[in-house]
Swiss-Prot record:
Biased composition (Low complexity): 11-21
Renumbered residue ranges of the record's region Disordered: 1-23
Keyword Electron transport among record annotations: no
Residues noted as binding ATP in the record, renumbered to the chain: G64, E65, N66, G67, A68, G69, K70, S71
Residues in ABC transporter domain copies: 32-267, 267-518
Superkingdom assignment: Bacteria
Function, as annotated: Part of the ABC transporter complex AraFGH involved in arabinose import. Responsible for energy coupling to the transport system.
UniProt similarity note: Belongs to the ABC transporter superfamily. Arabinose importer (TC 3.A.1.2.2) family.
Enzyme class: translocase
Biased composition (Polar residues): 1-10
Record's protein name: Arabinose import ATP-binding protein AraG 2
Length: 522
C-alpha cells in the first residue's frame, strides 16, 4: 500500500478525505457487479437470482431481516460460498473465488461482526498476517514493526504494535481489521454490523474512516439493522428479504422510513409496532425518592398493572443505572421501592426475582445469556430452584419439557433445546431471556434496550410479547434509545437526562420533538 493511500484514511489534520460532503463526491461506475447470483443449501435457497452493483466512491447499505440473505452474499464475495448460478465481476472482469485468499488477492475484504484476529499474536503480526516481511527465511521484526506503526499512525490509532491483540478494545481491534484490508489495498470493503459492540466515540471514529475510504474511490458495503446509520452514512441502500433483492434506493436523503421498513418485512410500520391500547390497573411498582449510583437527583415514578412504560434518554441519562437499582444489582443510597403497595428491599437480583421483578439487561451477550450453554440451560437457569426440593438433583425431564414448551410458545427458531444459544440470532436469544422470566412467574419486566441489534421482523414478535404480558396484568418497563420504538410501543414515556427525570409524556402527545427537547442537556 502506498503512503498516499494510508494518509487519506487517517482522518488527521491535512486529510481532505475524512469529511468530504456527500454532495461533493462523484461516485464512479460499478466497481463490483453481481448478476443473477443464486446460492442453495439442502432445502433452502439462500440467494435467489440476486443482482447488485456497488460503485467506486460510495457507501452502499444492505438491510434486511435475519435470514434475508445478507450474510450469504458476503460469503459469496469472500469466497466462502460458491454460487450455483450467476456472475460476479470486478471492474468489468468476471471473477470466481475458490477461497477467501483468492477474494483478498482480487481486492475484496470483509470486516465481520465477529472479528477474525489471532488474540495471542501482536498487533503488527495481525496486520501483516499472511504477508509477514522476511529476510533469509526469518521474519524481519524491524520491518514488520515499522510498517505496522506507519499503518496505525495513518489510521489515527496510537497503539503499540508489539502488544498482543487480546489486550485491545473492540473498537481498536476493528481498526486492526480495517488496517489489514488496507495493507492489501482492498478496493471493495464490506462491513457486517460494525457498530454492534462499539461506544459512541468508537462509532464516530469508524464513520470518519469509512468516509475517508469512500473519498479515495473504494466501494464500501455496509450491512446494518440500524436505520439511523443508513441515513447518516450511506449513499444508496438495497433491501433483501427471503433471499431476494427487493429494491435499491438510489438516494437515502428523501427515503421514507416507513417505506424502508415495509420493504424489509413485507408489511407496514403500523404492523411492526402493532400498538394495542389497554386499560391500566392498580399501581404495581413505585419508586419513592430513589437515589444511588448514576442518579443526580432522587427519582420517583409509578407503573401500573397492564402498562408499558417507556424510559427515553440520551447516553448517560441514568436509565440503566435506575433499572439496576430497581433490580437489586446496585444499592440505593436513599429512597425505596414498593411492590403491590408493600415496601421491599432487594439485597441482590435473586431477591428481586423471588419478589416478581426481573431485568433483561442492555448487554445481552455479556449479562443476559451464557453463550456456550444450550438454549434449554439458559432458559432453565432461574427455574431450576423449583425442580428439586433439595436443590441437589436436576429434574432433567421437567427441564426439557419446560424448554420445549417455551420454544413453541415464543416461536424460538432453534433446532431443539440442546442447540447452543450462541448459534441463535439476536432476536431468538432475547426470546430465550424472556422465556426464562416467564417460567418464573414475573410480574414486572425491566427491559433495557431489548431490541438492540435485532432485525425488524423479530422486533415485531417481541413487541407482541410485551402486549401479551401487559394484557395479562403484568407491567413492562421499556428502556429504549429508539425514538420510533419507545413512541410506538409505550403507553406513556418518562424522559431522563443527566441522572434525573426531566418529564413525562402521554401517548397522545408523544412525538420525537417532544422527547428530544426534554432529553437534551441545558
Amino acid at each position: 500500500m502506498t503512503t498516499q493511500t494510508m494518509t487519506a484514511v487517517s482522518g488527521n489534520d491535512g486529510d481532505t478525505g475524512a469529511d468530504v460532503d456527500a454532495g461533493a463526491r462523484k461516485p464512479g461506475g460499478p466497481l463490483l457487479a453481481l448478476d443473477g447470483i443464486t446460492v442453495t443449501f439442502p432445502g433452502v435457497r439462500a440467494l435467489d437470482a440476486v443482482s447488485l452493483s456497488v460503485r467506486a466512491g460510495e457507501v452502499h447499505g444492505l438491510m434486511g431481516e435475519n435470514g434475508a440473505g445478507k450474510s450469504t452474499l458476503l460469503k459469496v464475495l469472500s469466497g466462502v460460498n460458491q454460487p450455483q448460478a450467476g456472475t460476479l465481476a470486478l471492474n468489468g472482469t468476471a471473477q470466481r473465488f475458490a477461497s477467501t485468499r483468492a477474494a483478498l488477492e482480487a481486492g475484496i475484504a470483509i470486516i465481520y461482526q465477529e472479528l477474525h484476529l489471532v488474540p495471542e499474536l501482536t498487533v503488527a503480526e495481525n496486520l501483516m498476517l499472511g504477508q509477514l516481511p522476511s529476510r533469509l527465511g526469518v521474519v524481519d521484526e524491524r520491518t514488520l514493526a515499522a510498517r505496522a506503526l506507519d499503518a496505525l499512525e495513518r489510521l489515527g490509532e496510537h497503539i503499540d504494535p508489539g502488544i498482543p491483540v487480546k489486550y485491545l478494545s473492540i473498537g481498536q481491534r476493528q481498526m486492526i481489521e480495517i488496517g489489514k484490508a488496507l495493507m492489501r489495498d482492498a478496493r471493495v470493503i464490506a462491513f457486517d454490523e460494525p457498530t454492534s459492540s462499539l461506544s459512541a466515540r468508537e462509532t464516530t471514529q469508524l464513520f470518519r474512516i469509512i468516509r475517508a475510504l469512500r473519498a479515495e474511490g473504494r466501494a464500501i458495503i455496509y450491512v446494518t439493522h440500524r436505520m439511523e446509520e443508513v441515513y447518516e452514512l450511506c449513499d444508496r441502500v438495497t433491501v433483501f428479504r427471503d433471499g431476494r433483492r427487493i429494491d435499491t434506493f438510489d438516494s437515502v436523503t428523501d427515503l421514507d422510513r416507513d417505506r424502508l421498513i415495509g420493504c424489509m418485512v413485507g408489511r407496514s410500520i403500523e404492523d411492526v409496532y402493532g400498538y394495542r391500547p389497554r386499560t391500566a390497573g392498580d399501581v404495581l411498582i413505585e419508586a419513592k425518592g430513589l437515589a444511588g449510583p448514576g442518579l443526580s437527583e432522587p427519582v420517583s415514578f409509578t407503573a401500573r398493572r397492564g402498562e408499558i412504560v417507556g424510559f427515553f434518554g440520551l447516553v448517560g441519562a441514568g436509565r440503566s443505572e435506575l433499572m439496576k437499582l430497581l433490580y437489586g444489582a446496585a444499592r440505593p443510597s436513599a429512597g425505596h421501592v414498593e411492590l403491590n403497595g408493600k415496601r421491599v428491599a432487594f439485597g441482590s437480583p435473586r431477591d428481586a426475582v423471588r419478589a416478581g421483578l426481573a431485568l433483561c439487561p442492555e448487554d445481552r451477550k455479556q449479562e443476559g445469556i451464557v453463550a456456550i450453554a444450550s438454549v434449554a440451560d439458559n432458559l432453565n437457569i432461574s427455574a431450576r430452584r423449583h425442580f428439586s426440593p433439595a436443590r441437589m438433583l436436576l429434574d432433567a425431564r421437567r427441564e426439557r419439557e419446560l424448554a420445549q414448551r417455551y420454544i413453541e410458545r415464543l416461536a424460538i427458531k432453534t433446532r431443539d433445546g440442546d442447540t447452543p444459544i450462541g448459534a441463535l440470532s439476536g432476536g431468538n436469544q432475547q426470546k430465550v431471556v424472556l422465556a426464562r422470566w416467564l417460567a418464573e412467574r414475573i410480574d414486572v419486566f425491566l427491559m433495557d434496550e431489548p431490541t438492540r441489534g435485532i432485525d425488524v421482523g423479530a422486533r415485531a414478535e417481541i413487541y407482541n410479547l410485551f402486549y401479551e404480558l401487559a394484557e395479562a396484568g403484568r407491567t413492562v418497563i421499556l428502556v429504549s434509545s429508539d425514538l420510533a420504538e419507545v413512541i410506538g410501543v409505550s403507553d406513556r414515556i418518562i424522559v431522563m437526562k443527566e441522572g434525573r427525570i426531566a418529564g413525562e409524556v402521554a401517548k397522545a402527545q408523544a412525538t420525537p420533538d417532544a422527547l428530544i427537547k426534554l432529553a437534551l442537556p441545558r
